[in-house]
Curated annotation (Swiss-Prot):
Glycans are attached at N56, N126, N305, N324. It is an enzyme of class 2 (transferase). This is CMP-N-acetylneuraminate-beta-galactosamide-alpha-2,3-sialyltransferase 4. It comes from Pan troglodytes (Chimpanzee). Keywords: Disulfide bond, Glycoprotein, Glycosyltransferase, Golgi apparatus, Lipid metabolism, Membrane, Secreted, Signal-anchor, Transferase, Transmembrane, Transmembrane helix. One of its GO terms (molecular function) is beta-galactoside (CMP) alpha-2,3-sialyltransferase activity. The soluble form derives from the membrane form by proteolytic processing.
């Protein structure tokens, strides 16, 4: 080979070394690019990793609240919402009577479930992950994050969408699939009251929310599920070390994203995440979502400790309980 050729090879090798060093040295190096072929799914793998995170861990807890647990036998709860149902049982009973608690049969029957939790982070923008996301058995989305117009980056498949009344400002038919499960995360008794008025077309409630939820919401009641507060409890207790009893004015709680990861570790055998993470605190101008121009300032007063949650997610990544499809 001529000297010029050797110089070119040396230059390429140097560039490769620099790129590898930069990737390793970055704080957000918990990044696992999507393989072209499906990663093998090992039955029980997520459950095994989750037991190290959550301690005395069991999959006996139902994912969604069930009518039979409140109608025939009164299921006692030690905590009020969002960590339990204490004091809200009568209202909850009316909601469970008009909704369902089943998981889709095609998901329930899978021997090994491959899941991805799609966050709302800005780093999904121009990620071109859409096709890869659509290949998972279960795709979990959060709140009002849109799909229409962003399919190339976030995909179009939605198995479940976690939401609460104030985040329900999306068109259930446009931003979801006909068989998507819309999973209500109840933070307070008024959340049950809201979904009851929507589904039963009763007089709407306008007070008791930090942001006015939709008054008209065109949704099929068969798609609605009520998330078991057990997942909020273990996310708060085991991942964030938050006390279950907090003063009303200082209440901290997990984000919907961390809650969704906790749920996925319970439901799935393989768990990947995408679009998680916030800008550094000093970066005041960076938008936090892939679909809207809001910054970290909007999180003030939300009751979420994003720094603490970042540490919890990094711990899960280090343990291999979850893998990341975008930088973190």
């Amino acid at each position: 080979m001529c000297p010029a050729g050797w110089k070119l090879l040396a230059m390429l090798a140097l560039v490769l070394v620099v790129m590898v060093w930069y990737s390793i040295s970055r704080e957000d190096s918990f990044y696992f690019p999507i393989p072209e072929k499906k990663e093998p799914c090992l039955q029980g793998e997520a459950e095994s990793k989750a037991s190290k995170l959550f301690g005395n861990y069991s999959r006996d807890q139902p994912i969604f609240l069930r009518l039979e647990d409140y109608f025939w036998v009164k299921t006692p709860s030690a905590y009020e919402l969002p960590y339990g149902t204490k004091g809200s049982e009568d209202l909850l009973l009316r909601v469970l009577a008009i909704t369902s608690s089943s998981i889709r049969k095609n998901i329930q029957s899978l021997r090994c479930r491959r899941c991805v939790v799609v966050g709302n982070g800005h780093r999904l923008r121009n990620s071109s992950l859409g096709d890869a996301i659509n290949k998972y058995d279960v795709v979990i989305r959060l709140n009002n994050a849109p799909v229409a117009g962003y399919e190339g980056d976030v995909g179009s498949k939605t198995t479940m969408r976690l939401f609460y009344p104030e985040s329900a400002h999306f068109d259930p038919k446009v931003e979801n699939n006909p068989d998507t499960l819309l999973v209500l995360v109840a933070f307070k008794a008024m959340d049950f009251h809201w979904i009851e008025t929507i589904l039963s077309d009763k007089k709407r409630v306008r007070k008791g929310f930090w942001k006015q939820p939709p008054l008209i919401w065109d949704v099929n009641p068969k798609q609605i599920r009520i998330l078991n507060p057990f997942f909020m409890e273990i996310a708060a207790d085991k991942l964030l070390s938050l006390p279950m009893q907090q003063p009303r004015k200082i209440k901290q709680k997990p984000t919907t994203g961390l809650l969704a990861i906790t749920l996925a570790l319970h439901l799935c055998d393989l768990v990947h995440i995408a679009g998680f993470g916030y800008p550094d605190a000093y970066n005041k101008k960076q938008t936090i979502h892939y679909y809207e121009q809001i910054t970290l300032k909007s999180m003030a007063g939300s009751g979420h400790n994003v720094s603490q949650e970042a540490l919890a997610i990094k711990r899960m990544l280090e343990m291999g309980a979850v893998k990341n499809l975008t930088s973190f």
